Amino acid sequence: AGFKAGVKDYKLTYYTPDYKTKDTDILAAFRMTPQPGVPPEEAGRAVAAESSTGTWTTVWTDGLTSLDRYKGRCYHIEPVAGEENQYIAYVAYPLDLFEEGSVTNMFTSIVGNVFGFKALRALRLEDLRIPPAYVKTFQGPPHGIQVERDKLNKYGRPLLGCTIKPKLGLSAKNYGRAVYECLRGGLDFTKDDENVNSQPFMRWRDRFLFCAEAIYKAQAETGEIKGHYLNATAGTCEEMNKRAVFARELGVPIVMHDYLTGGFTANTSLAHYCRDNGLLLHIHRAMHAVIDRQKNHGIHFRVLAKALRMSGGDHIHSGTVVGKLEGEREITLGFVDLLRDDFIEKDRTRGIYFTQDWVSLPGVLPVASGGIHVWHMPALTEIFGDDSVLQFGGGTLXXPWGNAPGAVANRVALEACVQARNEGRDLAREGNEIIREASKWSPELAAACEVWKEIKFEF
Protein backbone atom coordinates (compact mmCIF):
# COMPACT_ATOMS: atom_id res chain seq x y z
CA ALA A 1 0.00 0.00 0.00
CA GLY A 2 2.95 2.28 0.61
CA PHE A 3 1.97 5.66 1.95
CA LYS A 4 -1.46 6.83 3.02
CA ALA A 5 -1.97 10.58 3.20
CA GLY A 6 -4.26 12.31 5.66
CA VAL A 7 -4.51 13.80 9.13
CA LYS A 8 -3.37 11.26 11.66
CA ASP A 9 -4.65 9.96 14.92
CA TYR A 10 -2.26 10.26 17.84
CA LYS A 11 -3.71 7.09 19.37
CA LEU A 12 -1.71 5.15 16.89
CA THR A 13 1.74 5.27 18.30
CA TYR A 14 2.50 7.78 20.99
CA TYR A 15 0.60 6.38 23.99
CA THR A 16 2.31 3.11 24.96
CA PRO A 17 1.42 2.11 28.53
CA ASP A 18 3.42 -1.10 28.28
CA TYR A 19 6.70 0.67 27.38
CA LYS A 20 9.63 -0.12 29.70
CA THR A 21 11.76 3.00 30.12
CA LYS A 22 15.44 2.74 29.26
CA ASP A 23 18.33 3.92 31.44
CA THR A 24 19.30 6.33 28.68
CA ASP A 25 15.85 7.89 28.19
CA ILE A 26 15.16 11.42 29.31
CA LEU A 27 11.94 11.18 31.33
CA ALA A 28 9.52 14.07 31.82
CA ALA A 29 6.55 14.49 34.14
CA PHE A 30 3.95 16.90 32.74
CA ARG A 31 0.93 18.19 34.65
CA MET A 32 -1.80 18.36 32.00
CA THR A 33 -5.15 20.10 32.12
CA PRO A 34 -6.94 18.90 28.96
CA GLN A 35 -9.70 20.96 27.33
CA PRO A 36 -13.21 19.81 28.30
CA GLY A 37 -14.09 16.63 26.45
CA VAL A 38 -10.50 15.69 25.58
CA PRO A 39 -9.60 12.34 27.20
CA PRO A 40 -6.29 12.32 29.13
CA GLU A 41 -4.80 9.60 26.90
CA GLU A 42 -5.41 11.76 23.86
CA ALA A 43 -3.76 14.76 25.57
CA GLY A 44 -0.83 12.64 26.76
CA ARG A 45 -0.09 11.30 23.30
CA ALA A 46 -0.35 14.79 21.85
CA VAL A 47 2.29 16.01 24.29
CA ALA A 48 4.63 13.09 23.52
CA ALA A 49 4.21 13.52 19.77
CA GLU A 50 4.51 17.29 19.55
CA SER A 51 7.61 17.38 21.77
CA SER A 52 9.38 14.70 19.70
CA THR A 53 8.82 13.40 16.14
CA GLY A 54 5.14 14.11 15.59
CA THR A 55 3.46 16.50 13.25
CA TRP A 56 -0.24 16.92 12.58
CA THR A 57 -0.36 14.93 9.38
CA THR A 58 1.29 11.91 7.83
CA VAL A 59 4.28 12.99 5.74
CA TRP A 60 5.92 10.73 3.16
CA THR A 61 9.37 11.42 4.64
CA ASP A 62 8.29 9.48 7.74
CA GLY A 63 9.11 6.44 5.63
CA LEU A 64 12.76 7.44 5.40
CA THR A 65 13.47 7.03 9.11
CA SER A 66 12.59 4.76 11.99
CA LEU A 67 9.97 6.68 13.95
CA ASP A 68 9.91 3.90 16.48
CA ARG A 69 13.47 4.63 17.37
CA TYR A 70 13.11 8.39 17.66
CA LYS A 71 9.66 9.08 19.03
CA GLY A 72 8.69 10.29 22.49
CA ARG A 73 6.31 7.92 24.26
CA CYS A 74 3.70 8.72 26.86
CA TYR A 75 4.07 5.62 29.05
CA HIS A 76 1.91 6.43 32.09
CA ILE A 77 -0.91 8.80 33.04
CA GLU A 78 -2.27 9.34 36.54
CA PRO A 79 -4.94 11.73 37.85
CA VAL A 80 -3.72 14.40 40.29
CA ALA A 81 -5.27 13.82 43.72
CA GLY A 82 -7.53 16.65 44.84
CA GLU A 83 -7.54 18.44 41.48
CA GLU A 84 -10.32 18.29 38.94
CA ASN A 85 -9.32 17.36 35.41
CA GLN A 86 -5.56 17.39 36.06
CA TYR A 87 -3.27 14.53 35.15
CA ILE A 88 0.42 13.75 35.38
CA ALA A 89 1.63 12.40 32.04
CA TYR A 90 4.98 10.64 31.99
CA VAL A 91 6.86 10.88 28.72
CA ALA A 92 10.07 9.07 27.74
CA TYR A 93 12.36 10.60 25.10
CA PRO A 94 15.12 8.62 23.41
CA LEU A 95 18.52 10.16 24.09
CA ASP A 96 19.31 10.61 20.39
CA LEU A 97 16.74 13.40 20.11
CA PHE A 98 19.06 15.77 21.99
CA GLU A 99 22.33 17.51 21.20
CA GLU A 100 25.07 16.70 23.68
CA GLY A 101 25.92 19.38 26.22
CA SER A 102 23.11 21.75 25.17
CA VAL A 103 20.51 22.73 27.74
CA THR A 104 19.15 25.05 25.08
CA ASN A 105 18.38 22.18 22.72
CA MET A 106 16.94 20.05 25.51
CA PHE A 107 14.42 22.76 26.38
CA THR A 108 13.63 23.58 22.77
CA SER A 109 12.70 19.95 22.24
CA ILE A 110 10.83 19.24 25.43
CA VAL A 111 8.99 22.52 26.03
CA GLY A 112 9.44 24.28 22.70
CA ASN A 113 6.07 23.98 21.00
CA VAL A 114 3.75 21.87 23.00
CA PHE A 115 2.66 24.48 25.55
CA GLY A 116 0.49 26.26 22.99
CA PHE A 117 -1.37 23.09 22.08
CA LYS A 118 -5.10 23.47 21.42
CA ALA A 119 -6.08 20.18 23.07
CA LEU A 120 -4.62 21.41 26.35
CA ARG A 121 -5.99 24.10 28.58
CA ALA A 122 -2.73 24.20 30.55
CA LEU A 123 0.53 22.29 30.81
CA ARG A 124 3.32 22.33 33.36
CA LEU A 125 6.64 20.52 33.27
CA GLU A 126 7.01 19.26 36.85
CA ASP A 127 10.25 17.29 36.67
CA LEU A 128 12.86 15.79 34.34
CA ARG A 129 15.02 12.71 34.83
CA ILE A 130 18.37 13.38 33.19
CA PRO A 131 20.12 10.07 32.48
CA PRO A 132 23.82 9.77 33.44
CA ALA A 133 24.66 9.25 29.76
CA TYR A 134 23.37 12.78 29.06
CA VAL A 135 24.64 14.33 32.31
CA LYS A 136 28.14 13.26 31.27
CA THR A 137 28.02 15.48 28.18
CA PHE A 138 27.87 18.60 30.39
CA GLN A 139 30.68 20.33 32.25
CA GLY A 140 28.25 21.45 34.94
CA PRO A 141 29.19 23.93 37.70
CA PRO A 142 32.61 25.54 37.21
CA HIS A 143 33.83 24.40 40.63
CA GLY A 144 31.21 23.02 42.96
CA ILE A 145 30.77 23.13 46.71
CA GLN A 146 33.97 21.49 47.97
CA VAL A 147 36.31 23.34 45.62
CA GLU A 148 34.63 26.62 46.57
CA ARG A 149 35.20 25.98 50.28
CA ASP A 150 38.84 25.20 49.56
CA LYS A 151 39.26 28.37 47.50
CA LEU A 152 37.66 30.51 50.21
CA ASN A 153 39.07 28.57 53.18
CA LYS A 154 35.67 28.62 54.92
CA TYR A 155 34.32 25.42 56.47
CA GLY A 156 31.59 24.16 58.76
CA ARG A 157 29.08 26.96 58.33
CA PRO A 158 26.85 28.60 55.74
CA LEU A 159 28.38 31.54 53.87
CA LEU A 160 27.02 35.05 54.35
CA GLY A 161 26.17 37.51 51.60
CA CYS A 162 24.46 40.83 51.09
CA THR A 163 22.98 42.53 48.05
CA ILE A 164 24.09 46.15 47.85
CA LYS A 165 21.14 48.56 47.98
CA PRO A 166 19.87 50.93 46.66
CA LYS A 167 20.36 48.68 43.70
CA LEU A 168 20.31 51.45 41.14
CA GLY A 169 21.58 55.00 41.41
CA LEU A 170 24.79 54.80 43.44
CA SER A 171 28.03 55.97 41.84
CA ALA A 172 30.77 53.37 41.49
CA LYS A 173 32.80 54.91 44.30
CA ASN A 174 29.94 54.93 46.80
CA TYR A 175 28.95 51.46 45.70
CA GLY A 176 32.46 50.21 46.41
CA ARG A 177 32.33 51.90 49.78
CA ALA A 178 29.16 50.02 50.70
CA VAL A 179 30.82 46.77 49.60
CA TYR A 180 33.85 47.46 51.78
CA GLU A 181 31.75 48.20 54.86
CA CYS A 182 29.83 44.93 54.58
CA LEU A 183 32.88 42.77 53.96
CA ARG A 184 34.82 44.52 56.70
CA GLY A 185 32.01 43.78 59.16
CA GLY A 186 32.20 40.05 58.64
CA LEU A 187 30.28 38.99 55.53
CA ASP A 188 31.91 36.60 53.07
CA PHE A 189 30.32 38.09 49.97
CA THR A 190 28.49 41.10 48.70
CA LYS A 191 26.42 41.06 45.55
CA ASP A 192 25.54 43.15 42.55
CA ASP A 193 21.80 43.32 42.20
CA GLU A 194 20.52 41.40 39.19
CA ASN A 195 19.56 44.65 37.42
CA VAL A 196 23.01 46.16 37.84
CA ASN A 197 24.72 45.72 34.47
CA SER A 198 26.28 48.85 33.01
CA GLN A 199 24.05 51.89 33.31
CA PRO A 200 24.72 55.59 32.76
CA PHE A 201 25.19 56.35 36.48
CA MET A 202 27.64 53.46 36.97
CA ARG A 203 29.50 51.81 34.12
CA TRP A 204 30.60 48.24 34.67
CA ARG A 205 34.33 48.84 34.49
CA ASP A 206 34.25 51.53 37.18
CA ARG A 207 32.18 49.30 39.43
CA PHE A 208 34.51 46.33 38.96
CA LEU A 209 37.50 48.48 39.85
CA PHE A 210 36.05 50.00 43.03
CA CYS A 211 34.64 46.67 44.17
CA ALA A 212 38.01 44.97 43.68
CA GLU A 213 39.59 47.69 45.79
CA ALA A 214 36.97 47.13 48.49
CA ILE A 215 37.60 43.38 48.46
CA TYR A 216 41.37 43.71 48.85
CA LYS A 217 41.08 46.30 51.58
CA ALA A 218 38.60 44.18 53.54
CA GLN A 219 40.73 41.06 53.07
CA ALA A 220 43.80 42.83 54.38
CA GLU A 221 41.96 44.02 57.48
CA THR A 222 40.08 40.84 58.36
CA GLY A 223 42.50 38.14 57.25
CA GLU A 224 39.59 36.35 55.56
CA ILE A 225 39.00 35.77 51.87
CA LYS A 226 36.25 38.05 50.57
CA GLY A 227 34.28 38.26 47.34
CA HIS A 228 31.78 40.42 45.50
CA TYR A 229 29.53 38.92 42.83
CA LEU A 230 30.40 41.10 39.87
CA ASN A 231 27.46 40.89 37.49
CA ALA A 232 28.83 40.07 34.05
CA THR A 233 25.38 39.84 32.43
CA ALA A 234 25.31 41.92 29.25
CA GLY A 235 23.45 42.48 26.00
CA THR A 236 25.74 40.25 23.94
CA CYS A 237 27.80 37.17 24.75
CA GLU A 238 30.94 38.98 23.61
CA GLU A 239 30.34 41.83 26.03
CA MET A 240 29.58 39.38 28.85
CA ASN A 241 32.84 37.59 28.16
CA LYS A 242 34.75 40.88 28.14
CA ARG A 243 33.45 41.59 31.65
CA ALA A 244 34.41 38.15 32.90
CA VAL A 245 37.91 38.59 31.46
CA PHE A 246 38.32 41.93 33.24
CA ALA A 247 37.18 40.36 36.52
CA ARG A 248 39.82 37.68 36.09
CA GLU A 249 42.47 40.31 35.39
CA LEU A 250 41.54 42.06 38.64
CA GLY A 251 42.06 38.76 40.43
CA VAL A 252 38.65 38.70 42.11
CA PRO A 253 37.19 35.31 43.08
CA ILE A 254 33.67 35.37 41.67
CA VAL A 255 31.40 36.74 38.95
CA MET A 256 27.67 36.59 38.51
CA HIS A 257 25.11 35.94 35.76
CA ASP A 258 21.33 36.20 35.34
CA TYR A 259 20.87 32.83 33.69
CA LEU A 260 17.25 33.02 32.56
CA THR A 261 17.30 36.51 31.08
CA GLY A 262 20.84 35.95 29.75
CA GLY A 263 19.89 32.57 28.33
CA PHE A 264 21.32 29.08 28.67
CA THR A 265 23.70 29.42 25.74
CA ALA A 266 25.36 32.49 27.24
CA ASN A 267 25.34 30.90 30.68
CA THR A 268 27.06 27.72 29.54
CA SER A 269 29.74 29.75 27.73
CA LEU A 270 30.37 31.76 30.87
CA ALA A 271 30.51 28.63 33.03
CA HIS A 272 33.16 27.15 30.75
CA TYR A 273 35.18 30.37 30.93
CA CYS A 274 34.87 30.38 34.71
CA ARG A 275 36.21 26.86 35.09
CA ASP A 276 39.08 27.53 32.71
CA ASN A 277 40.05 30.64 34.64
CA GLY A 278 39.34 29.78 38.26
CA LEU A 279 36.37 32.11 38.73
CA LEU A 280 33.39 31.07 40.83
CA LEU A 281 30.00 31.72 39.22
CA HIS A 282 27.00 33.06 41.13
CA ILE A 283 23.66 32.62 39.39
CA HIS A 284 20.61 34.80 39.87
CA ARG A 285 17.22 33.54 38.69
CA ALA A 286 15.61 36.82 37.57
CA MET A 287 12.46 36.06 35.51
CA HIS A 288 11.92 32.63 37.08
CA ALA A 289 8.48 33.51 38.47
CA VAL A 290 7.25 34.31 34.97
CA ILE A 291 7.92 30.66 34.15
CA ASP A 292 7.33 28.81 37.41
CA ARG A 293 4.75 30.70 39.45
CA GLN A 294 1.52 29.29 38.03
CA LYS A 295 0.63 25.98 39.61
CA ASN A 296 -0.90 24.49 36.47
CA HIS A 297 1.12 26.00 33.63
CA GLY A 298 4.79 26.62 32.92
CA ILE A 299 7.88 24.89 34.29
CA HIS A 300 8.50 24.08 37.95
CA PHE A 301 11.62 25.70 39.40
CA ARG A 302 13.12 22.31 40.20
CA VAL A 303 13.49 21.78 36.45
CA LEU A 304 15.13 25.18 36.00
CA ALA A 305 17.45 24.30 38.90
CA LYS A 306 18.43 20.98 37.32
CA ALA A 307 19.04 22.76 34.03
CA LEU A 308 21.30 25.25 35.78
CA ARG A 309 23.35 22.47 37.36
CA MET A 310 23.91 21.09 33.86
CA SER A 311 24.59 24.47 32.26
CA GLY A 312 26.85 25.54 35.11
CA GLY A 313 26.81 27.76 38.20
CA ASP A 314 28.29 27.53 41.70
CA HIS A 315 25.50 29.38 43.55
CA ILE A 316 21.84 29.75 42.67
CA HIS A 317 19.01 31.61 44.37
CA SER A 318 16.42 29.14 45.58
CA GLY A 319 13.94 30.87 47.88
CA THR A 320 14.07 31.21 51.66
CA VAL A 321 11.39 28.84 53.03
CA VAL A 322 11.14 31.01 56.14
CA GLY A 323 7.70 32.40 56.87
CA LYS A 324 6.13 30.43 54.03
CA LEU A 325 3.71 27.52 54.18
CA GLU A 326 4.90 24.24 55.67
CA GLY A 327 4.35 22.36 52.41
CA GLU A 328 6.70 24.64 50.55
CA ARG A 329 9.49 23.75 52.92
CA GLU A 330 9.57 20.13 51.74
CA ILE A 331 9.28 21.09 48.08
CA THR A 332 12.07 23.68 48.40
CA LEU A 333 14.32 21.26 50.25
CA GLY A 334 13.62 18.78 47.47
CA PHE A 335 15.19 20.95 44.79
CA VAL A 336 17.87 22.21 47.18
CA ASP A 337 19.01 18.59 47.51
CA LEU A 338 18.78 18.18 43.73
CA LEU A 339 21.28 21.02 43.51
CA ARG A 340 23.69 19.77 46.17
CA ASP A 341 23.64 15.97 46.26
CA ASP A 342 25.03 13.33 43.91
CA PHE A 343 22.04 11.03 44.08
CA ILE A 344 18.44 11.88 44.98
CA GLU A 345 15.71 9.28 45.48
CA LYS A 346 12.27 9.73 43.98
CA ASP A 347 10.04 11.24 46.67
CA ARG A 348 6.66 12.64 45.69
CA THR A 349 6.13 14.37 49.04
CA ARG A 350 9.12 16.57 48.14
CA GLY A 351 7.97 17.01 44.55
CA ILE A 352 10.68 14.73 43.20
CA TYR A 353 9.10 12.60 40.48
CA PHE A 354 12.20 10.65 39.45
CA THR A 355 15.32 9.26 41.05
CA GLN A 356 18.15 11.46 39.76
CA ASP A 357 21.76 10.28 39.56
CA TRP A 358 24.12 13.16 38.85
CA VAL A 359 27.15 10.84 38.85
CA SER A 360 30.08 13.15 39.59
CA LEU A 361 28.67 16.47 38.39
CA PRO A 362 29.72 19.11 40.96
CA GLY A 363 27.02 20.51 43.26
CA VAL A 364 25.57 24.01 43.48
CA LEU A 365 25.18 26.05 46.68
CA PRO A 366 21.58 27.19 47.22
CA VAL A 367 21.24 30.87 48.08
CA ALA A 368 18.53 31.99 50.49
CA SER A 369 17.77 35.63 49.80
CA GLY A 370 14.88 38.03 50.12
CA GLY A 371 13.26 39.50 53.21
CA ILE A 372 15.37 37.67 55.78
CA HIS A 373 16.99 39.15 58.91
CA VAL A 374 18.80 38.11 62.10
CA TRP A 375 15.73 36.57 63.74
CA HIS A 376 15.50 34.12 60.85
CA MET A 377 19.07 32.91 61.34
CA PRO A 378 18.27 29.83 63.50
CA ALA A 379 15.59 28.68 61.06
CA LEU A 380 17.84 29.20 58.05
CA THR A 381 20.75 27.35 59.67
CA GLU A 382 18.41 24.51 60.57
CA ILE A 383 16.72 24.28 57.18
CA PHE A 384 19.62 24.78 54.79
CA GLY A 385 22.51 23.33 56.79
CA ASP A 386 26.13 24.27 56.14
CA ASP A 387 26.12 24.10 52.36
CA SER A 388 24.27 27.29 51.56
CA VAL A 389 24.68 31.02 51.18
CA LEU A 390 22.44 33.21 53.35
CA GLN A 391 21.92 36.63 51.85
CA PHE A 392 20.67 39.60 53.82
CA GLY A 393 20.27 42.75 51.73
CA GLY A 394 18.05 45.06 53.74
CA GLY A 395 18.81 42.75 56.67
CA THR A 396 22.38 44.07 56.66
CA LEU A 397 22.18 47.57 55.21
CA UNK A 398 19.22 48.58 57.30
CA UNK A 399 20.90 47.96 60.64
CA PRO A 400 20.46 51.26 62.48
CA TRP A 401 24.19 51.94 62.90
CA GLY A 402 25.22 51.29 59.30
CA ASN A 403 26.48 48.55 57.02
CA ALA A 404 29.48 47.28 58.95
CA PRO A 405 27.59 46.87 62.24
CA GLY A 406 24.76 45.28 60.26
CA ALA A 407 27.26 42.79 58.87
CA VAL A 408 28.67 42.18 62.35
CA ALA A 409 25.16 41.44 63.63
CA ASN A 410 24.58 38.83 60.94
CA ARG A 411 27.95 37.17 61.44
CA VAL A 412 27.51 37.00 65.22
CA ALA A 413 24.01 35.57 64.82
CA LEU A 414 25.27 32.96 62.36
CA GLU A 415 28.24 31.90 64.50
CA ALA A 416 25.95 31.68 67.54
CA CYS A 417 23.51 29.44 65.67
CA VAL A 418 26.24 27.19 64.30
CA GLN A 419 27.82 26.84 67.72
CA ALA A 420 24.47 26.09 69.36
CA ARG A 421 23.74 23.47 66.73
CA ASN A 422 27.15 21.87 67.20
CA GLU A 423 26.47 21.69 70.93
CA GLY A 424 23.35 19.71 70.14
CA ARG A 425 20.75 22.37 70.88
CA ASP A 426 17.46 22.41 68.99
CA LEU A 427 17.46 25.48 66.75
CA ALA A 428 13.78 25.06 65.90
CA ARG A 429 12.74 25.39 69.53
CA GLU A 430 15.45 27.53 71.07
CA GLY A 431 16.18 29.81 68.13
CA ASN A 432 14.95 33.05 69.67
CA GLU A 433 16.74 32.29 72.92
CA ILE A 434 20.04 31.64 71.13
CA ILE A 435 19.83 34.99 69.33
CA ARG A 436 18.90 36.79 72.56
CA GLU A 437 21.86 35.31 74.43
CA ALA A 438 24.26 36.29 71.66
CA SER A 439 22.91 39.84 71.57
CA LYS A 440 23.88 40.33 75.23
CA TRP A 441 27.54 40.51 74.33
CA SER A 442 27.16 41.98 70.84
CA PRO A 443 25.71 45.49 70.82
CA GLU A 444 25.51 45.37 67.00
CA LEU A 445 23.33 42.28 67.14
CA ALA A 446 21.24 43.78 69.94
CA ALA A 447 20.56 46.84 67.78
CA ALA A 448 19.57 44.67 64.81
CA CYS A 449 17.32 42.49 66.99
CA GLU A 450 15.56 45.62 68.18
CA VAL A 451 14.82 46.83 64.64
CA TRP A 452 13.26 43.57 63.46
CA LYS A 453 11.77 42.30 66.69
CA GLU A 454 8.16 42.86 65.70
CA ILE A 455 8.60 40.76 62.57
CA LYS A 456 7.39 37.26 63.34
CA PHE A 457 9.81 34.38 63.66
CA GLU A 458 7.97 31.39 62.25
CA PHE A 459 9.17 27.99 61.14
Swiss-Prot record:
Binding-site residues for Mg(2+), renumbered to this chain: K191, D193, E194
Q: Does the keyword Lipid biosynthesis apply?
A: no
Q: What does the Swiss-Prot or TrEMBL cofactor note state?
A: Binds 1 Mg(2+) ion per subunit.
User: Pfam families this protein is in?
Assistant: RuBisCO_large, RuBisCO_large_N
Q: What does this protein do?
A: RuBisCO catalyzes two reactions: the carboxylation of D-ribulose 1,5-bisphosphate, the primary event in carbon dioxide fixation, as well as the oxidative fragmentation of the pentose substrate in the photorespiration process. Both reactions occur simultaneously and in competition at the same active site.
Give residues where N6,N6,N6-trimethyllysine occurs.
Answer: K4
Identify the residues that bind substrate.
Answer: N113, T163, K167, R285, H317, S369
The record's listing under HAMAP family reads: RuBisCO_L_type1
Localisation per UniProt entry: Plastid, Chloroplast
Enumerate the CDD domains for this protein.
RuBisCO_large_I (cd08212)
Other remarks on this protein: The basic functional RuBisCO is composed of a large chain homodimer in a 'head-to-tail' conformation. In form I RuBisCO this homodimer is arranged in a barrel-like tetramer with the small subunits forming a tetrameric 'cap' on each end of the 'barrel'.
Q: What is its EC number?
A: 4.1.1.39
One GO molecular function term of this record is:
monooxygenase activity
Q: What is this protein called?
A: Ribulose bisphosphate carboxylase large chain
Modification comment? The disulfide bond which can form in the large chain dimeric partners within the hexadecamer appears to be associated with oxidative stress and protein turnover.
GO CC, alphabetical: chloroplast
> According to its UniProt record, which reaction does this protein catalyse?
2 (2R)-3-phosphoglycerate + 2 H(+) = D-ribulose 1,5-bisphosphate + CO2 + H2O; D-ribulose 1,5-bisphosphate + O2 = 2-phosphoglycolate + (2R)-3-phosphoglycerate + 2 H(+)
Q: What is its main location?
A: plastid
Active site positions: K165, H284
**Which chain positions carry the site (Transition state stabilizer)?**
K324
List-wise, which residues carry N6-carboxylysine?
K191
